Amino acid sequence: MEVLEGLYYSKDHEWVKVEGDKAYIGITDYAQHSLGNIVYIELPEVGAELSAGDVLGVVESVKAASDVYTPVDGKVLEVNNAIVDDPSLVNNDPYGSWMALVELKDKSQLDNLMTAEEYKKFLDEE
């Protein structure tokens, strides 16, 4: 499983890429691999105010449907409609296929997430 350096990871297998006071959120390689071929993605509304732990969206595969949770508080600034049009993008490039761009409300929440090294150890225990 690919784990990229420089991202933050949640125990629910979401990744967060921080750029200033904004963050891109998506699902990890482990998550997409576990789901199998992704056939449908539901994203949040632009402008939605989300709290950490809220459902960010839904990813459906031929095997299962899975909620995706936001690991941080934030306002949805943008969604990636390309993955709605072609959900297989997430299978092919999970770290390039973000789901939502949010305005971070509290950067200290990032301290609750895992680094790449911590996430690799977490995956070894899964």
From Swiss-Prot:
Coiled-coil regions listed:
none
| Stretches assigned to the Lipoyl-binding domain | 22-103
Give cofactor(s), names only.
Answer: (R)-lipoate
The record describes how the cofactor is bound as: Binds 1 lipoyl cofactor covalently.
Q: Which GO terms describe its cellular component?
A: cytosol; glycine cleavage complex
A GO term (biological process) for this protein? glycine decarboxylation via glycine cleavage system
Q: Which Pfam families match?
A: GCV_H
PTM-bearing positions, type N6-lipoyllysine? 63
Q: How does it assemble?
A: The glycine cleavage system is composed of four proteins: P, T, L and H.
Similarity field: Belongs to the GcvH family.
Functionally, this protein is described as follows: The glycine cleavage system catalyzes the degradation of glycine. The H protein shuttles the methylamine group of glycine from the P protein to the T protein.
What HAMAP family is this protein classified in? GcvH
The name on file for this protein is: Glycine cleavage system H protein
User: What is the organism of origin for this protein?
Assistant: Thermoanaerobacter sp. (strain X514)
Lineage per the UniProt record: Bacteria, Bacillati, Bacillota, Clostridia, Thermoanaerobacterales
Q: Which gene encodes it?
A: gcvH
